Each structure stands twice: as C-alpha cells, then as structure tokens.
C-alpha cells in the first residue's frame, strides 16, 4: 500500500541529519542536492520557506496545526518564539515525528503536542484551528483530494491555510528527479499540482489568496471565508493528469 511505502521511506530519513541538511540547504551535501535537484541556492531555499511561513503572525497566540511536521527542523525554532500559541504537530511517520519531538524537548517547548495521524482523516472537530501550516507535504500525500478537504474542514472560518510544496512543469530537471528518483523511493506521490491548477484550486476554496513560486516550489497563504457554505458550493478543479 502506498501509505506504508511512504512511511517506510521516511523511516529511513527520520533520524538522518542528511535530511535536515537537505531541507534547510545548510550542509555541504544538502546544498549539493538543492542545487542539483531544485536548482536553488540557500538564499532561494530560505526565501520560499519564509514566504510560506509568513502567514503566521508575529506573537501568534491561537491554535495551529502543522501537518506534516516531518523532523521539525523548519518549525521548532519558530515555535520557540510563540510561547502563547497552542500548537499541534501531526505526521503519518512515527520516526519523523520522534525527531521533531526530540527537537521540541531540546528547546523546552511546552506548548507543542504531537500526534500520529493521516491528513486524509484528521482526528479533529470541524473549525478547530486558526492556522493550518503544511510545509513540503502535499506532494507526498497519496490522497490529496482528501487532504485538501480535511484541511478546509478543521480550519475555522476566517482562519489561514499556508505552506509550500512541489509543483510540476516549472523546471525540467526537477521534474525528472521527482519522477525517476523521489517517486520510486516513496517520498513523492503523483498526481501533482501545476502553478495554474494550484491557483485555481485555492481561489475556488479560499479568499485573500496570496501565492507564488520559486522554480518548482510553490508557496501560498490563503484565508477561509466566513461564509464557507458559499465557497464549498463551488466546483473544485481536478488534478491535471501526468502524461
């Protein structure tokens, strides 16, 4: 099953500093991967991540869900600056989440809780969170339609959905690595959004959509309308089929 393949792939990286170095583009090997696969340097890598997380206000004190949390390398230092926030971190991989929990413990974070779970069936009530953050997750989710629905469901009206993930069709070399390496290793799962399909989807589901991309990484910040019934009635665009 695809979910088990994904869990196995991330089991191999959960305790691996190479993964953290690659995600942050901060080690020699990580910088090499960023350049080879993503055609980015560290400044570019930092730029799209900063855009993705700019949807979290300074001194945020509401309820935030991060899915997937991964190893926590990108967000635990940020959460250290948000002592009044109520933060929940969810991941399908217990091995990745263990690394995130260890980082939280080292930073003495008391307002962050962890839970293993599936983004396609979130174990939370409707309208629970003020912010849902998803960094580098949707390109891995096997049931993306369910993930989009669940994120929308648990986000309160007026809440913010922000994050980033891979979009196809922006850089040929990146697309090749995704198709021939990352998919085969179990890290990525088709189908994928394009810049245009993602914009159409977010515009159809949310209001105040701010979105852009840096090469093959799209970032977005959008708000759930308070009149959510009207938004839900709109027909959502389907994924473009990969040729």
Model-based region annotation:
Residues 1-60, 77, 179-182:
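Conserved class I S-adenosyl-L-methionine
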Residues 13, 29, 36-38, 162-220:
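C-terminal alpha-helical "lid/dimerization" subdomain adjacent to the S-adenosyl-L-methionine
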Residues 63, 158-160:
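Short glycine-centered segments of the SAM/dcSAM-binding site in methyltransferase folds
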Residues 63-121:
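Class I SAM-dependent methyltransferase SAM/SAH-binding core
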Residues 120-131:
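A short acidic, Gly/Pro-enriched loop at the edge of an enzyme's catalytic core
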Residues 131-143:
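A short SAM/SAH-binding and catalytic strip from SAM-dependent methyltransferases
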Residues 145-157:
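A short glycine-rich, Lys/Arg-flanked "PGG" loop and its adjoining helix->strand segment in the class I
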Residues 204-243:
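Core SAM-dependent methyltransferase catalytic element
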């Amino acid at each position: 099953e695809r979910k088990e393949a994904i869990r196995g792939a991330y089991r191999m990286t959960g305790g691996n500093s190479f993964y953290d170095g690659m995600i942050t583009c901060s080690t020699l090997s990580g910088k090499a991967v960023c350049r080879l696969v993503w055609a980015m340097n560290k400044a570019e890598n930092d730029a799209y991540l900063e855009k993705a997380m700019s949807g979290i206000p300074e001194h945020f004190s509401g309820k935030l869900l991060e899915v997937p949390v991964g190893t926590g390398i990108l967000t635990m230092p940020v959460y250290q600056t948000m002592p009044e926030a109520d933060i929940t971190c969810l991941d399908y991989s217990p091995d990745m989440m263990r690394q995130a929990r260890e980082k939280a413990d080292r930073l003495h974070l008391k307002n962050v809780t962890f839970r293993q779970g599936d983004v396609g069936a979130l174990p939370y009530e409707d309208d629970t969170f003020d912010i849902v953050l998803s960094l580098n997750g949707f390109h891995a989710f096997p049931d993306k339609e369910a993930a989009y629905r669940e994120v929308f469901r648990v986000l309160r009206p007026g809440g913010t959905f922000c994050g980033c993930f891979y979009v196809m069709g922006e850089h040929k070399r990146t697309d090749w690595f995704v198709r021939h390496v990352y998919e085969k290793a179990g890290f990525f799962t088709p189908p994928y959004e394009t810049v245009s399909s993602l914009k159409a989807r977010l515009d159809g589901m949310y209001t105040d959509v701010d979105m852009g991309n840096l090469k093959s990484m799209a970032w977005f910040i959008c708000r759930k309308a308070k009149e959510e019934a009207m938004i839900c009635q709109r027909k959502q665009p389907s994924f473009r089929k990969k040729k």
